[in-house]
Amino acid sequence: MVHLTPDEKAAVTALWGKVNVDEVGGEALGRLLVVYPWTQRFFESFGDLSSPDAVMGNPKVKAHGKKVLGAFSDGLAHLDNLKGTFAQLSELHCDKLHVDPENFKLLGNVLVCVLAHHFGKEFTPQVQAAYQKVVAGVANALAHKYH
């Protein structure tokens, strides 16, 4: 569960309504793979990840980034039940994919950077603070099955 004030919730919802999930999802996942290259081991089937340009232009990275942000959107609609919303994804990433749960925090922070880049002055410190709460809550929910 993420505890947002009514103003924080309104800010998160208003900005998210302007997010191009295809574009931001691909960019966020791509940046994760470039900035934290050890995360690429979970995406070996995606083909060429040999350079930043290859990663950022990879259609499988873009498609999976869109899928990731689709799940994030679901979480935004269920902020009061993030653990329930992400239970199946938590189990998948824990039991089958063996993803280090620290990677969820990294992706959340990268997403915040990408949102700041896309929205500039509209991404105020207050909006960032609200999004940091949300991505921390999502990362915690995704790591739930690890505990």
From Swiss-Prot:
Gene3D superfamilies: Globins
Tissue: Red blood cells.
Entry superkingdom: Eukaryota
GO molecular function, one term: organic acid binding
BP terms from Gene Ontology: hydrogen peroxide catabolic process
Signal sequence, start to end: none
Gene Ontology cellular-component terms listed: blood microparticle; haptoglobin-hemoglobin complex; hemoglobin complex
Family to which the UniProt record says this protein belongs: Belongs to the globin family.
Oligomeric form and interacting partners: Heterotetramer of two alpha chains and two beta chains.
Protein name, UniProt field: Hemoglobin subunit beta
Source species of the chain: Colobus polykomos (Western black-and-white colobus monkey)
